Amino acid sequence: MPTINQLVRRPRKPSVSANKAPALQHNPQKRAVCVKVYTTTPKKPNSALRKVARVRIAGYGSEVIAYIPGEGHNLQEHSVVLIRGGRVKDLPGVRYHIVRGALDTKGVQGRKKARSKYGVKRGS
């Protein structure tokens, strides 16, 4: 434990937390272009075919893996998408989500609940 004199000479440093979504460069969302759309399997003990896309961020050039939420999608290579932060716990390396219903991404067909999260208009 430091003395008060030591703290006067050299104050405590505030701990700096690491950025969880560095590719967004402190923006809430960024536009990106799909490079590859594919499925991948989650870590143990889960089992599924999770839909993901490798995307190149516009005006920045870095490539990241983004998760495609919801059932079914219309994405293919060269689709323009909007990505946001938010990792997928059982997919290592996936730290971004694609925003449904924005740019080239269609909303989830037949969605009735939690519509705002999946880009579905009311009554459709």
Swiss-Prot record:
GO cellular component term, pick one: small ribosomal subunit
Residue ranges of the region described as Disordered: 1-24
3-methylthioaspartic acid: modified positions: 90
Ranges annotated as spanning the membrane: none
UniProt-listed GO biological process terms: translation
Subunit: Part of the 30S ribosomal subunit. Contacts proteins S8 and S17. May interact with IF1 in the 30S initiation complex.
NCBIfam families named among the record's database cross-references: rpsL_bact
Similarity section: Belongs to the universal ribosomal protein uS12 family.
Role this protein plays: With S4 and S5 plays an important role in translational accuracy.
Record-given protein name: Small ribosomal subunit protein uS12
